[in-house]
């Protein structure tokens, strides 16, 4: 991903989101949007808290990782929320170094994460609808030129070089 940082695992039950804003102050912008996500989770009775610079935690376990980058005139905050991710598949795909886990006092990836489905009674469709109602403030219509630009970006992201090893 353009924002750098760790690896992002994606499957059909890992909810991803992005905010694109003209705000340029990195720490204020990042904090604003990550806190919006945490507050939304708290509305559901989930004891979500931001941790460090880029994680959202539930009872000390990570449920959301987030990143930030800036391009001229825009800042982008994006993240993931683990709803019902297959932990075994994720662990097989993402293998942080033992040194990183030990430095954080973590025995394994499994010990460090939690899934939203274990904290709420909403199914993924209901949770996604709740997320849209609480975090989206409107609809944007994309025109042909924007769609063409998106298709060009998508081509880059679908190359094996990007998927398996291109780092910003």
How would you describe each model-predicted region?
Residues 26-43:
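Long, well-ordered alpha-helical scaffolding segments within enzyme catalytic domains
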Residues 58-67:
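A short beta-strand motif that forms the metal-chelation/ATP-contact edge
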Residues 46-59, 142-148:
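Short, surface-exposed recognition loops or helix-turn segments adjacent to catalytic cores
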Residues 37, 44, 64, 72-166:
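Long, positively charged amphipathic alpha-helical accessory segments at protein N-termini or as interdomain linkers
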Residues 1-27:
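N-terminal lobe of the biotin/lipoate ligase/transferase fold
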């Amino acid at each position: 991903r353009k924002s750098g940082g760790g690896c992002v695992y994606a499957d059909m039950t890992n909810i991803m989101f992005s905010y694109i804003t003209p705000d340029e102050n990195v720490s204020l912008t990042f904090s604003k949007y990550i806190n919006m996500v945490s507050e939304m989770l708290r509305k559901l009775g989930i004891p979500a808290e931001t941790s460090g610079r880029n994680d959202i935690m539930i009872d000390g376990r990570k449920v959301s990782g987030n990143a930030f980058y800036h391009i001229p005139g825009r800042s982008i905050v994006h993240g993931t929320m683990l709803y019902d991710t297959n932990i075994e598949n994720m662990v097989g795909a993402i293998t942080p170094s033992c040194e990183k886990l030990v430095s954080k006092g973590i025995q394994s990836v499994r010990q460090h994460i939690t899934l939203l489905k274990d904290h709420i009674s909403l199914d993924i469709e209901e949770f996604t609808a709740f997320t849209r109602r609480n975090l989206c403030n409107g609809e944007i219509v994309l025109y042909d030129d924007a769609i063409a630009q998106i298709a060009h970006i998508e081509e880059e992201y679908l190359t094996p070089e990007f998927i398996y090893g291109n780092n910003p």
